[in-house]
């Protein structure tokens, strides 16, 4: 973990130094010192035997290949990963719902790094598992916290991360296959609100702490289409959003770079200054 944190710091520092986030160019020691004093929040569920996947997908598997002493006298361990693109904390690439959209390896890295806001919709979602976040929710948030910055990463906190890893509570069902898809019941983002985020706030990306940016009962996935057809990637199954402030923090969301991928596992880190 220590090595990971140091690696994250180095990456964030690089973004500040060379302008990945569009904030600066060149070397600024002050930015590095600010990062040294920053707090990092991991927004990623660990992948393991209890990782939640879409009802039609196979479970994540870590298959042991070798572990032990070698003839050369040194210890060696290696595993093989078996996983769906769209399971656990992951990204949806535009091609997931747009035949002309960007594949995972084609998404500009600028989409993964930037200032972010957290929209807390946990109260209405607690009352209604089928709640869809509306434009009015965004207008009310802006009345309380100020305008959502243009080109921000918007994170929607439904409160459903607290149910992880219970499939029954998180997805609304333990059923698998098509029957399981038909029984899904969790909140999401209304397609009209998604269109508003794209047109009025030019968002970089949208994330949510449920299994899908569309609510569970969706059959046409209009919200996916509204975002991905405009090359706005989606982050799903986020964790620990409750630990974030409402605004003025940064996000680094780096997916595995898969050629031709429609999605993939995502490590998401918030940087609190």
Where are these regions (language model features)?
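Positively charged n-region of N-terminal signal peptides that target proteins for export
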Residues: 1-7
